Amino acid sequence: MKHFSLNTLLCTIVVASIAIAPCESDDKLITQTCSKTPYPAQCISYIKADDNSKDVRDVPGLGIIMAQVLVLEAQAPKDILFVLLGAGKRPDIQVQLKTCLESYSFIIKTAMPAAIDSFKIGKPRLAEDYANTAALVVSKCEKSFNGKSPITNENNVTHEVARILGAIAKQL
């Protein structure tokens, strides 16, 4: 009876070790990758919030997740800008609103799909360029309002995510 219990215990330990090992390595990959970005804690938080992160085994996979995060984060300011433009209550800022809306549309519809494709085909420099461009156009959007846009918080978050994405791509 003792022999059976010992074998059962050993089998349980081996199976548990195998099941836990990938999780530890995923956490290590995420932590190591995010530690080389300008916002490590936010990077870890964004990536771990994505259910697919547990299946990612390499840095390009983390880059794809961050590009998807950028699309999601860019959607809120785009929606706000669209509503503000439609309301037409502030004719003095219509040009800036339209320019910012076009920038966010570019990020969502062009830059991030291209960045994701760049990671998939092994061209991380292109992904880095798209991320840096996204950060730049968001900064220009905010500056066009002298730092007091109706979407300052959203611009800051989008800029942060774009910088994280650029830093991840640069590691490749």
Predicted feature locations:
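Terminal membrane/secretory targeting segments in land-plant proteins
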Residues: 1-27
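Folded extracytoplasmic luminal domains of secretory or organellar precursors
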Residues: 24-172
